[in-house]
Amino acid sequence: MAAPESLSPGATAEEAPEEDEDDAEAEDPERGTGSGGRSGSLGGSGGGTAGPGMALGGALTRRAVTLRVLLKDELLEPGEGVLSIYYLGRKFTGDLQLDGRIVWQETGQVFNSPSAWATHCKKLVNPAKKSGCGWASVKYKGQKLDKYKAAWLRRHQLHMPVATADESPTSEGEEEELLLEEEEEDVLAGVSSEDKGHRPPGKGSLEPEATPPGKRMDKVPVPIRYCMLGSRDSARNPHTLVEVTSFAAINKFQPFNVAVSSNVLFLLDFHCHLTRSEVVGYLGGRWDINNQMLTVLRAFPCRSRLGDTDTAATVEEEIYQVLFLRGLSLVGWYHSHPHSPAVPSLQDIDAQMEYQLRLQGSSNGFQPCLALLCSPYYSGNPGPESKICPFWVMPPPEQRPSDYGIPMDVEMAYVQDSFLTNDVLQEMVMLAEFYKGAPDLVKFQEAWSPEHTYLDKLKMSLASRTPKDQGMCHVLEQVCSVLKQGS
């Protein structure tokens, strides 16, 4: 699909569609007009600026309320990054200048009005977009601009009913779109429709409510659907989470079968529980090309920090040696989202696509690469058990090569091992020692819930992945004891 044609900010009526805000700039009472100006629009005569009585007498409409007017009356203050637009998963940030113009931070383009900027940005994401309410789409320090316009009108046009002043200047057909955009913003902010319905009534203030002292307000990212992504965009947040798609939903069959050992999930889950930071590891197994069966037999935790490239190289070399000695192949990788949903981010999707191509190599035969994503502490998990998401990335359609890869949900067969192997127990001991005393180590003696500690939570999650033979449970208790002491 061809890139949308570049728009000249504020140059055409299309960029300020519903309010003709560029015309409103000319009507701006704070800018003044010459003898040939449009003073008649303010109810005056001749070339002078309309007096206060005329301006407040009702002739001054919403169209004449510009950013410059709000700045002059100190409802807004100029600043860098104070303006923002959220649209279909994209965030745009702008600077508000002293003269009321908007500078888009990404390109430095200057726009004369909120509608000009909003329409330009939305067309970049959705070329079919024709118009939109700029004052309802653009936010100033987190609050929609139309609220500031309504506040100005209430201040200066006292005869106007409050309900009328609060109405957004939306044209016919735009209300539904604005509702959809608001729903999307709530999704990106992690606000459900149920939470939205239980919000307390507004206080009438234009300033965001302060966070209570000492209370941490973390916004949990909420995944978006793949169809909302569109073409690849470097300005998009790489940590945007994307829902996985089932093969059935696109009328395709999963191209390979997967069987995973319970010991793999046991060790993986244990590793991901240890720290509040993201962890990474590799998966070893075998690929049976005749039966199209991928069997995952071993997990290899990386006992290194994500930023420690020197240690990571040494650890990876050790893992490759063990794989070779055991006659196993590298068949995938795993990592954690400690407090976020177990779905991949855009960064994860690109990484998985790269790993798939690496494992494929120059051979013509197909060899899959599996990704496992574990979320141990996400508040949306239904219980104490970690959520583990297996996924694989399908390349984008040939006609849309610039799109992101499609994260596909992979069905796995679970194979319960007979016992915990010494390799697994040894890895658990080494992991406990590696994270011992680390600042991001989970404090296992603290409360995870009113009834259970974090150590209880770990044990309950591992219980679903234990082998048939429970004879090694005393060793597991020893490992858990080490964790409790170390945290």
Swiss-Prot record:
Positions with biased composition (Acidic residues): 15-28, 172-187
Alphabetized UniProt keyword annotations: Acetylation, Hydrolase, Metal-binding, Metalloprotease, Phosphoprotein, Protease, Zinc
Chain positions with N-acetylalanine modification: A2
InterPro entries the record matches: JAMM/MPN+_dom, JAMM_MPN+_peptidase_M67A, MPN, RAMA
Residue numbers binding DNA: S113, S115, W135
Superkingdom: Eukaryota
The protein's Enzyme Commission number: 3.4.-.-
Keyword Zinc: yes
Positions of post-translational Phosphoserine modification: S8, S168, S171
Domain MPN: 258-393
Top-level class of the enzyme under EC nomenclature: hydrolase
Compositionally biased region (Gly residues): 33-55
SUPFAM superfamilies, alphabetized: JAB1/MPN domain (SSF102712)
A single BP term in Gene Ontology: proteolysis
Post-translational modification: Degraded following binding to N(6)-methyladenosine methylated DNA (m6A).
Job description of the protein: Probable protease. Acts as a sensor of N(6)-methyladenosine methylation on DNA (m6A): recognizes and binds m6A DNA, leading to its degradation. Binds only double strand DNA (dsDNA) in a sequence-independent manner.
Subunit and interaction comment: Monomer. Mainly monomoric, but when binds to dsDNA, forms homotetramer assembled into two homodimers. May interact with histones; this interaction is facilitated by.
Protein name per Swiss-Prot or TrEMBL: MPN domain-containing protein
Species assigned in the record: Mus musculus (Mouse)
Lineage: Eukaryota, Metazoa, Chordata, Craniata, Vertebrata
